[in-house]
Amino acid sequence: MANSYLVRTPGSAGNTKKFTISAWVKRSLLGSTYSTIFSSWSADSIAGHFALRFDGSDRLDLSTWSVNVLTTNRLFRDTSAWYHIVCAVDTDESTADNRVRFYVNGVEETSFSTRNNPSSGQTFSVNNTNSQTVGLNNYSSTAGSMDGYMSHVAMVDGQQLAPTVFGQTDSTSGIWKFKSPSGLSWGTNGFHLKFENSANLGLDSSGQTNN
């Protein structure tokens, strides 16, 4: 799956300051330069490039063109495990540390090797009228492919959400598991990719027809 990715260019802009990305991922190649979950690109700038990925040291990382926004201390090296990754963004938040939040398997990440909070009101290329890509760092057709498996990739345009919208703890096993999001306002460019249709892997199940 190293070279598989999906790309969409929205016809109209949504909220470039507030959004939530959720994805279930299972890694297969460790120590890759980058292993990208979601990216968007319009220009070589902070506002123009956004990449949610695992870095070459297997840390979860959010980077813009020239700034690493968040990089975890935690390493993600279990190739047998599914990780539920949530990146929740709201740059209008008055508390700087709440402008970008990472959650893994329902628990917020709080230990970071790098933290550069976005400025208040910072815009990103996410939800803008430029390429939005799942599984590749889309400033290049060969950069930072996911090298793993992905399931239930979702993006909610206009809301900074908790992981409990997309997952829940199993009452018997105590394991964090998928929960179908319901009652959501997905926003202009929101989508939910289940990857259930092999003939149309980019089929949007959110009801927004953002295929």
Describe the predicted segments one by one.
Residues 62-84:
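Short, aromatic/His-centered strand-loop micro-motif at the edge of beta-sheets
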Residues 9-11, 71-77, 121-123:
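Beta-strand-rich interaction surfaces with strong enrichment in secreted/lumenal proteins
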Residues 9, 39-41, 50-55, 61-65, ...:
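Beta-strand-rich, repetitive solenoid scaffolds
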Residues 23, 80-91, 102:
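Short tryptophan-centered beta-strand motifs in secreted/extracellular beta-sheet-rich domains
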Residues 3-61, 93-96, 159-164:
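Extracellular glycan-recognition modules
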Residues 2-3, 94-96, 101, 110-115, ...:
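Extended recognition patches within non-cytosolic domains
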Residues 1-5, 45, 62-69, 113-115:
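Extracellular beta-rich ligand/substrate-recognition surface
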Residues 124-150:
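Extracellular glycan-interaction patches encoded by glycine-rich segments
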